[in-house]
Regions:
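The feature captures the beta-strand-to-loop junction immediately N-terminal to the Walker
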Residues: 33-35
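Conserved structural motif at the start of ABC-family nucleotide-binding domains
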Residues: 2-4, 17-19
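Catalytic Walker B motif of ABC-type/P-loop ATPase nucleotide-binding domains
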Residues: 146-150, 155
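Conserved ABC transporter NBD signature motif
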Residues: 55-69
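Helix-to-loop junction immediately C-terminal to a conserved catalytic motif
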Residues: 48
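ABC-family P-loop ATPase nucleotide-binding domains
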Residues: 78-133
Length: 227
């Protein structure tokens, strides 16, 4: 579904991505892990079609990221600017107009699972509630690939388990999901594969099962050791 060959991106004389090569097939939840400044967000923005000034080849279902992949990829940035004065149900209506593949019924089902009222205005929601709304909006698209950038950074630890269970319950294994996060311990239980970025270089690309079997440690411990 995603093929990346010799991907390099230089910004202000610094390689924020340095000769990255990786192929990702369907049926996986992939963790994109790395410290701040490692290149995670840049890679995600390239896959979302928001960054074009790079060298190398990037293919999503045979197409270069951009207008031809907008219906394939559902992208959730680390901060989604929502009109603070809109009610949640009005945001849902906007998404229904903007995305042909948006499922309003699914959105309200997810919203209910998070115990959030559709009558609330965005400005009445906490940071954690806003992130849950963003997750519900993203998962309610009928996309082939879902890319979530730090989806739980503002969610309290107790609610993270609920969010992760929601992600698992709504993941179609005919598709692909990439979760970029620094919360390695929380997400490792849902991951099939882990990618570690360090200073723009892809230093680890292994299945979670192989990490546990070959290195005799969990993803977080391995992440700490490698980086």
């Amino acid at each position: 579904m995603i093929d990346i060959k010799d991907l390099t991106m230089v910004y202000n004389g610094r390689a924020v991505l340095d000769n990255v090569n990786v192929s990702l097939s369907q049926g996986q939840i992939v963790g994109l892990l790395g410290e701040n400044g490692s290149g995670k967000t840049t890679l995600i923005r390239i896959l979302a079609g928001l960054e074009r000034n790079y060298q190398g080849d990037v293919s999503i279902c045979g197409n270069r990221p951009g207008s031809l992949t907008n219906d394939i990829v559902a992208y959730q940035p680390d901060h989604l600017p929502l009109d603070e004065n809109l009610k949640i149900e009005e945001v849902c209506s906007v998404y229904s107009i903007f995305y042909d593949d948006f499922d309003s019924n699914k959105f309200y089902k997810l919203l209910n699972s998070f115990e959030i009222s559709k009558e609330l205005k965005i400005k009445e929601c906490s940071k954690g509630m806003k992130e849950k709304i963003q997750i519900a909006l993203t998962l309610s698209r009928k996309a082939k690939i879902y890319i979530l950038d730090e989806p739980m950074s503002g969610i309290d630890p107790k609610s993270r388990k609920i969010v992760l269970n929601t992600i698992i319950d709504n993941f179609d294994y005919q598709g692909l999901m990439i979760i970029s996060t620094h919360l390695v311990l929380e997400v490792e239980k849902v991951l099939d594969r882990a990618l570690f970025l360090d200073n723009g270089k892809l230093v680890v690309n292994e299945s979670v099962d192989d990490i546990r079997e070959n290195h005799h440690m969990g993803v977080e411990e391995y992440f700490t050791e490698v980086l």
